[in-house]
């Protein structure tokens, strides 16, 4: 899992397989100040495509001042 955050927001990314054995990039994101969150599932056909999707997401999040946390 890759975790990113700003002072008030968080964004988590992971690669999983669903019940049908399809590959998904799952993004959970929301505000640290409320209990509400969102989930986005992106269907991909291979690990290479999943890594491309994650790289694109990371570039966008970095432009919005998110930082990677460990």
Residue map of PLM features:
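Negatively charged, low-complexity tracts enriched in Asp/Glu with abundant Ser/Thr
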Residues: 1-7, 36, 47
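Compositionally biased amphipathic helical and low-complexity segments enriched in hydrophobic
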Residues: 5, 24-25, 48, 59
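A short, charged, amphipathic alpha-helix used as a generic interaction element across diverse proteins
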Residues: 35-38, 45-63
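Short aromatic-glycine-(Arg/Gly/Cys) micro-motifs in beta-strand/loop hairpins
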Residues: 14-40, 63
């Amino acid at each position: 899992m890759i975790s990113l955050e700003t002072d008030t927001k968080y964004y988590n990314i992971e690669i999983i397989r669903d019940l049908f054995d399809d590959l998904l990039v799952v993004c959970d994101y929301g505000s640290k100040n409320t209990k509400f969150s969102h989930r986005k599932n992106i269907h991909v056909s291979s690990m290479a495509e999943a890594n491309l999707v994650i790289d694109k997401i990371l570039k966008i999040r970095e432009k919005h001042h998110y930082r990677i946390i460990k």
